[in-house]
Amino acid sequence: MYPILLGINGISYGSFTECELNVLPRLMNIVDRGVVENKKPQYPDKSWWTILNMEPTNNTPSDPSLAPLVKLTRAALINIPVVNPTYGLYSIKLDQGTSYEEEVNNVIGALIKTAAKAPVIAAITAPDRFLHNNQSIKCNVYSVIDEAIGSLINGGVSAFILFSPYGEPVGPNEGDHEEYGIYIATISRPRHYDTVKLYEIGMLFRDLVESTLGV
Amino acid sequence: MANDASKDPELDKLLERKAKEIAKGVKNTGNVVELNHSNFNDFIKTHDVAVVDFWATWCAPCFMLEPIIKRLAVEMPNVGFGRLNTEEEPEIAAKYYVMSLPTVMIFKNGDPVDQVVGVVPKKILQDRIKAYLND
């Protein structure tokens, strides 16, 4: 299997405990872990462009496949929220029209299938789409994601970066989230005692692809 | 005159006792106090039992522990709960030999009496704190 970069917009470590998750807490004890730092306001498109461009940027090219990270890694894209509807092999509208179960299952299914042939960059947007206005379903959303990550690992993915570009939604406004997201990966970071910046996630995935494929 | 008075050890003891009485009277409403060099000493001295969560922004398990501390602050209103960012206040962390994060330190009458390192289930932390409560 080829390396994968999977971003889950709007999840936080705190809810691993609150929702008594099974897979993600165990995973973070096995591989490298860190905290993604992204100050308010945090928007999905701007956050993802920073990752794809591997630098803090306001540059938003019209075609995500031309972004430096995509060109360097030749990664396939799945459900990337730089545009609405999302960009890639699987795509949804950034509203509540697609249920969180459907999105998570389809992204993970496409990921496992595609990672057999190429590196993959994928996103899950469900927490961001559903938790701004409805915290009561939080642990249901987290449980579906947790289980899906389990099937991803069982599906043979062994080189990965799982992250959230920002933490959980705080209140109804689109750009309001907790400022700290998750980073769980099979590639070690050079500065362990520092938070992970968005542009570094792109660079780390480039390094992961290079080290895994020897390119 | 005011300066002379503040150097009086008897007066300091009296003020400290009074502050404790006030703190006892005011129930903790479940909030976790953000601590720094200007309020740390007062915080640990004015609570019979105080619990301090030493954390840092880069520490993933620290974020996992946070909801447990918040929950305990609600369930144990007679205990003072605070958190200290060790990146912003390294001197305080060094003073208490905090080597790993997260570290939860339990203070009784201002002195450290116990500590728990890492993320542990709420029940374990609660039992450790309860051991230092008088009633």
Feature names for model-found ranges:
Chain A
Residues 2-3, 10-116, 198-215:
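Active-site-proximal alpha/beta segments of enzymes that process anionic O-linked groups
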Residues 3-13, 23, 141-173, 183, ...:
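Metal-dependent active-site segment of extracytoplasmic phospho-/sulfohydrolases and closely related
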Residues 20-26, 138-141, 176-179:
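Glycine-rich, phosphate-binding/catalytic loops in enzymes
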Residues 173-212:
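Substrate-binding rim/cap in mid-to-C-terminal beta-strand-loop elements of soluble/periplasmic
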Residues 54, 123-125, 186-188:
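Structured loops at beta-to-helix junctions and adjacent beta-edge loops in soluble globular domains
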Residues 10-13, 82-86, 125-129, 167-169, ...:
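Short, solvent-exposed loop/turn segments at secondary-structure junctions
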